[in-house]
């Protein structure tokens, strides 16, 4: 192994007994079968071959073990050594995670690029995930020697960056009486900052902890979620809301805008931290995230502008990286998310895309000669998906002080040809609570975000009712009315195609016009403009209120005039006489949230009053 990567492994190997080694018997792509592995455990981490490739045991039979290797296996030979490490695949958790970019098994890509000077990851490279020499500003809580600590207790804070305070917690499986706690100061991840004594045994702790990726981190209790995940996308916030701690799926064919929605969630959602996992997607998309995010800023409540990258961690496992590591990347991402949740933060995890993860499962399953199920996917696909999505939720964290945290999972799904009956999509939909279905036809019409409002749904609407009641008591009825208008438009479209628009009743013409307003000027949103890239919830509510108000007033005016002898009020008359109000309705989306909430709400209220006055004047004229 080149000296440049440190001699940590070499010394470890030299001290090992011969019994710690097995030998390669068979190589089939990323799957390696090794003999002489008696005593090994399932999911144990191993080092394969003379290059020390990282692998994980996925099947045991007699003294032979089947290993999935997370690196390119070209050049491995029969009888190459396989070294056992006696520990599962784990991630390092501590200060330094945020703003970093890792590969699927938590190797820091920036560090590897600097050390190797290569554009590709060298085989067998072993670099610590977090920088052990960097110094962090350690501030202990008001506790001292003799105090008792239990698993999950927060005993110090570390200044991670100007956006996030990093709380240092005791690992969930530790407890005892404090015999030493470091005074405030600068410490690295190697330095002992805490010593506990339990049943006469003393144990030292650093700010770093490791956790096996396949094991969910323990919590005190799971709670019912009741706070919305505000994404800044009108169609999602208003019609199909998710909650902090929810599970969402974004299935859609290629070119429908899954990645743009995932990135918008990362940039603008009301989460405290974001873990973005690029799992088997194009490398350019991760490069785009790396270029965009450091330049993007978010405005904090105290008016400070901070880079979005300071609250983001990227796990990049692009399509040209080894297939087996895709499976690990999802678990790496969710474990990092759970770590920040345990500090009391609301974390969002974007998995783009879970279909590529399922394809990795299918490939490994095929190499193991397991019985294929639907479309060649393994029979345990639904169980694996469920075990991943079940790690989401709002929880009461372990230890003190009492705090709640949440992990929201948003999984993009790429069904081949946009077919939602694909096994991955149907298995995902049986688990998740929110379905944002993207439509190829809408994308072809350049209607973005291309969320189909007729097939999408959210099962969290009931859980959020108390929030909406406090925010705006009218919102639920306004949303119901808007949905009815969109549904009615779909029914009328068939009639229009048969007999034309002119044959419709006046009220139906108004319904079609309102639906067009909702579709083109409310649900469609331009992610690349300063005024529309992010829509605050109050703006979404007021825009919808004014459009629904116009619909109600127009229908009322037509129905009132229908029974009178005077001039009839028709849809064309309304459009002709109230053209400027109509134009103002269309232009609501151009109001820039940067002007502030008060200024915008005043404008929307004025429009609402002008609509009422305009229709009243029209009714008086035609009497």
Swiss-Prot record:
Pfam families in the cross-refs: ATP-synt_ab, ATP-synt_ab_N, ATP-synt_ab_Xtn, ATP-synt_VA_C
InterPro entries recorded: ATP-synt_VA_C, ATP-synth_a_Xtn, ATP_synth_asu-like_sf, ATPase_a/bsu_AS, ATPase_F1/V1/A1_a/bsu_N, ATPase_F1/V1/A1_a/bsu_N_sf, ATPase_F1/V1/A1_a/bsu_nucl-bd, ATPase_F1/V1_b/a_C
Binding-site positions, ATP: 252-259
EC number from the UniProt entry: 7.1.2.2
EC class: translocase
Keyword Cell division: no
One term under GO cellular component: proton-transporting V-type ATPase, V1 domain
Catalytic activity: ATP + H2O + 4 H(+)(in) = ADP + phosphate + 5 H(+)(out)
Gene3D superfamilies from the UniProt entry: 2.40.30.20, 2.40.50.100, Bovine Mitochondrial F1-atpase, Atp Synthase Beta Chain, Chain D, domain 3, P-loop containing nucleotide triphosphate hydrolases
Presence of the UniProt keyword Translocase in the record: yes
A GO BP entry: ATP metabolic process
One MF annotation (Gene Ontology) recorded for this entry: proton-transporting ATPase activity, rotational mechanism
Transmembrane stretches, start-end: none
Keywords: ATP-binding, Hydrogen ion transport, Ion transport, Nucleotide-binding, Translocase, Transport
Cross-referenced HAMAP family: ATP_synth_A_arch
Sequence similarity: Belongs to the ATPase alpha/beta chains family.
Biological function: Catalytic subunit of the peripheral V1 complex of vacuolar ATPase. V-ATPase vacuolar ATPase is responsible for acidifying a variety of intracellular compartments in eukaryotic cells.
Subunit structure: V-ATPase is a heteromultimeric enzyme composed of a peripheral catalytic V1 complex (main components: subunits A, B, C, D, E, and F) attached to an integral membrane V0 proton pore complex (main component: the proteolipid protein).
Name recorded for this polypeptide: V-type proton ATPase catalytic subunit A
Source organism of this protein record: Gossypium hirsutum
Phylogenetic classification of the source organism: Eukaryota, Viridiplantae, Streptophyta, Embryophyta, Tracheophyta
């Amino acid at each position: 192994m080149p000296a440049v990567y440190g001699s940590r492994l070499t010394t470890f190997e030299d001290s090992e007994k011969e019994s710690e080694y097995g030998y390669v018997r068979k190589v089939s792509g990323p799957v390696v079968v090794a003999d002489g592995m008696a005593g090994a455990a399932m999911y144990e981490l191993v080092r394969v071959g003379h290059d020390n490739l990282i692998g994980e045991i996925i099947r045991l039979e007699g003294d032979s073990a089947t290993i999935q290797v997370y690196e390119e296996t070209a050049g491995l030979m029969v009888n190459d050594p396989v070294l056992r490490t006696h520990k599962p695949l784990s991630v390092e958790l501590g200060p330094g995670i945020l703003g970093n970019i890792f590969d699927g098994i938590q190797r820091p890509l920036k560090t590897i690029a600097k050390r190797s000077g290569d554009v590709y990851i060298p085989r067998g490279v072993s670099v610590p995930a977090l920088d052990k020499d960097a110094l962090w500003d350690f501030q202990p809580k008001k506790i001292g020697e003799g105090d008792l600590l239990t698993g999950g207790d927060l005993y110090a804070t570390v200044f991670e960056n100007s956006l996030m305070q990093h709380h240092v917690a005791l690992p969930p499986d530790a407890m005892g009486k404090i015999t030493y706690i470091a005074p405030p100061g600068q410490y690295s991840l190697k330095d002992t900052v805490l010593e506990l004594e339990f049943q006469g045994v003393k144990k030292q702790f650093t700010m770093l902890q490791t956790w096996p990726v396949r094991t969910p981190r323990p919590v005190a209790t799971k709670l019912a979620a009741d706070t919305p995940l505000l994404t800044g996308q009108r169609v999602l916030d208003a019609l199909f809301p998710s909650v902090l701690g929810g599970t969402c799926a974004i299935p859609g064919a290629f070119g429908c805008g899954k990645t743009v929605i995932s990135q918008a969630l990362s940039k603008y959602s009301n989460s405290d931290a974001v873990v973005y996992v690029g799992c088997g997607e194009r490398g350019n998309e991760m490069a785009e995230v790396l270029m965009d995010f450091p330049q993007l800023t978010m405005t904090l409540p105290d008016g400070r502008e901070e880079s979005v990258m300071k609250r983001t961690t990227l796990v990049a496992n692009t399509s040209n990286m080894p297939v087996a590591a895709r499976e690990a990347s999802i678990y790496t991402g969710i474990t990092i998310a759970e770590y920040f949740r345990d500090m009391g933060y609301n974390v969002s995890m974007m998995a783009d895309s879970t279909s590529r993860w399922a394809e990795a499962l299918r490939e490994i399953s095929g190499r193991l000669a397991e019985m294929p199920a639907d479309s060649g996917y393994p029979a345990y696909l639904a169980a694996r998906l469920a075990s991943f999505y079940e790690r989401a939720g709002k929880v009461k964290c372990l230890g003190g002080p009492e705090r709640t945290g949440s992990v929201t999972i948003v999984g993009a799904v790429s069904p081949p040809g946009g077919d939602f009956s694909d096994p991955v999509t149907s298995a995902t939909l049986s688990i998740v609570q929110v379905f944002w279905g993207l439509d190829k036809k809408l994308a072809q019409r350049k209607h973005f975000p291309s969320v189909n409002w007729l097939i999408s749904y959210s099962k969290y609407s009931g859980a959020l009712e108390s929030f909406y009641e406090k925010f705006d008591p009218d919102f639920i009825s306004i949303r119901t009315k808007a949905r009815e208008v969109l549904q009615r438009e779909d029914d009328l479209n068939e009639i229009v195609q048969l007999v034309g628009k002119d044959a419709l009743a006046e009220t139906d013409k108004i319904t079609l016009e309102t639906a067009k307003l909702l579709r083109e000027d409310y649900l469609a949103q331009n992610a690349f403009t300063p005024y529309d890239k992010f829509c605050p919830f109050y703006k979404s509510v007021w825009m919808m209120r004014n459009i629904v108000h116009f619909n109600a007033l127009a229908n009322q005016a037509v129905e009132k005039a229908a029974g009178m002898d005077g001039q009839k009020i028709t849809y064309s008359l309304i459009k002709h006489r109230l053209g400027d109000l109509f134009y103002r309705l269309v232009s609501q989306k151009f109001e820039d949230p940067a002007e502030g909430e008060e200024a915008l709400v005043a404008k929307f209220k004025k429009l609402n009053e002008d609509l009422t006055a305009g229709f009243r004047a029209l009714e008086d004229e035609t009497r």
